[in-house]
Amino acid sequence: MTTPSTEMPPPSLTIIVAATSSHLGIGLKGTLPWRLKPEIAYFKRATTYHPENRTNVVIMGRKCWESIPPKFRPLPTRHNIVLSRKGKVEGISEESAGVEVASSLRDALTRLKGSEFGRIFIIGGGEVYQEAMQMASCDRILFTEVKADMETDVDYPIDFRRDQEWARMSHEELEAFVGGEVHKGDIIEDDLSYEFQMWERKP
């Protein structure tokens, strides 16, 4: 007699990314090509809110981690996982609070199986986004569309806006997911226009 499999399904992954509308540029010389204060506040709220007040997880590549000013890392009130093929990152040890190192995205997700953490966010960079997009469990993208044609040297790997597998959700659904009011429509700051959006993979 065959015993039914009780293996838990892979956890849902949410990508959060800001990119240009023209070519989905996301980075320049190891950092963001812009600094938008409301976008930073939105990122913090989106990645910390959980309807059951659980601690969320943010997963990032080593270069993304190093682009965060040391005084702001690990990102507070979230469990940080930094990916490094070597399995180690300078300044992070087993005793480091709120942060750990995994050798790959799949390794990170294996570590999270059965944990009490909340939502899992993929926050960059390009290679990590690409690997996550290939996983069926990656089913949501919080996309900040920066409506400008700016110089970048790193682009988002897949234009999901033109992929029939993905659909843009309503603004009300975005607000429900992030747990509060979100500015609707374009925000203009420092001559840049940008908009908060949520996309989901079709079932």
Listing of model-derived features with the role each one plays in the protein:
Residues T2-P203:
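Enzymes that bind and transform nitrogen-containing heteroaromatic metabolites
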